[in-house]
Amino acid sequence: GDSTPIDTQRDILRTTFDLGINHFDLANNYGPPYGSAETNFGRLLKEDFRPYRDELLISTKAGWDMWPGPYGSGGGSRKYVLASLDQSLQRMGLDYVDIFYSHRFDAHTPLEETAGALASAVRQGKALYIGIS
């Protein structure tokens, strides 16, 4: 998020990568404010880690409130899941993530709809793997 200086975030990412950690797990609502963890990670990826993209496993999640209106209130609807992924990819400056998760169960959306949206993300080349956390 924005509460930690970007240079500190850079030092943390460099140190973890140098120690062999290559899985960076994010979510659309990580911050504060929401989305800032992905934005900052994307900035550092571009500035420091772009040559190492194929060595990284980058995951993100969607499922919590993110924007006003009927489809931004989180959950597992196809509209929300796919819009959230597009927004996450834009914030990180990526074409795809390695793993895209539905962050939480949504009692108002059939699991089949959420699973179908996740499968669409793979078919569209926006995620290599999917999961439910």
Which residues make up each language-model segment?
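A cross-domain feature marking catalytic cores of carbohydrate-active enzymes
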Residues: 26-28, 56, 60-62, 101-104, ...
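N-terminal binding-site loop/beta-alpha segment at the start of enzyme catalytic domains
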Residues: 1-57, 95, 123
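Generic hydrophobic, aliphatic-rich segments that mediate packing or membrane embedding
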Residues: 37-41, 54, 58, 77, ...
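Generic detector of intrinsically disordered, low-complexity, polar/charged segments
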Residues: 28, 32, 39, 60, ...
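Glycine/proline-rich, positively charged
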Residues: 65-133
